[in-house]
């Protein structure tokens, strides 16, 4: 009590002393009476000193800056503006060809450092994957520790291939030997390393289990390049093919392989392992190959691989794919198709190159859909059994698989519906391509 009384007397004395001072010497203190977190400053919200609030930008607290940033995001374009069917435009209204094929540009980047980029054309926009089949396939892949090129290569068709309305309509391309490649092609987003993880000895069995579980009629398997292995992984691929055929003997199997460093014996080993379609991509024309693919991959080596596969098993369907939009010329494409026909390649596909990330080579041009249609007609006229050609077509795109499945079933002596029928000669297959009737 005595201490409290002394404290009160001290405070009273200090107050009396300050009150006796002249007004000019008494310090003036401005106290903030409230806290505001709005993104706009109110006149009665003293965030800053009133002496300079009229001629300077208010200083925002960290929480206010976060709120302001969120408001800007909310006021900007929504996610639907970046996928097909989104935004305020009506996709059902037909466009004039000039307007439909015109490429629009946009400025992106921070103030003072904005760059002009070409926006993705409308014909290259795809929906976001979200379907029961998509979730089921993804769950099975994770449970069995398997990888797909659909995910690793960021394929734009993943929602279409994985999201089929039924098991027979859904397709996934299994990627063997891990998710890390020893090569670094300038167009590919698959991870790369000189020393990738060792092969999974359980992968052949797990792959066979997954494919038999899905109940698909046509399956594509691809693989990374493994130059760190003596055989390039050819024996691992061949074993996987045999395991799949044991668990699902009626399944039609396509393998998209590497070049095995030019070892044609390994190519023959895979070609005769029991698969139905041997695919190896030349990717681009010969003149652009050194700038597009890894230095260990050459155009002539790819031709030798395709030729060796056909020689090892003449009834095998061979297939390759070419990307457009890299700067190739019409004359170069003609020469490429001639070279492919010279080694008896049966199927060719054309697709638009789409830059996966800023670290990869830039797109030279977005090729119009009518140009893809033109190249399809030319390829069929040259004698290819089938040609899938379009901006979103990829080497394992299921539109091509449906036709190849029909051809293979007829060669086996089945009808297109599996009911049975006479075997198909090459002339019958060509008649199928032309839309005729096979007798």
Swiss-Prot record:
Binds 2 [4Fe-4S] clusters per subunit. One cluster is coordinated with 3 cysteines and an exchangeable S-adenosyl-L-methionine. GO terms for molecular function: 4 iron, 4 sulfur cluster binding; lipoate synthase activity; metal ion binding. The keyword Ligase does not apply. Its EC number is 2.8.1.8. It catalyses: [[Fe-S] cluster scaffold protein carrying a second [4Fe-4S](2+) cluster] + N(6)-octanoyl-L-lysyl-[protein] + 2 oxidized [2Fe-2S]-[ferredoxin] + 2 S-adenosyl-L-methionine + 4 H(+) = [[Fe-S] cluster scaffold protein] + N(6)-[(R)-dihydrolipoyl]-L-lysyl-[protein] + 4 Fe(3+) + 2 hydrogen sulfide + 2 5'-deoxyadenosine + 2 L-methionine + 2 reduced [2Fe-2S]-[ferredoxin]. Pathway: Protein modification; protein lipoylation via endogenous pathway; protein N(6)-(lipoyl)lysine from octanoyl-[acyl-carrier-protein]: step 2/2. Belongs to the radical SAM superfamily. Lipoyl synthase family. This is Lipoyl synthase, mitochondrial. It comes from Paracoccidioides lutzii (strain ATCC MYA-826 / Pb01) (Paracoccidioides brasiliensis).
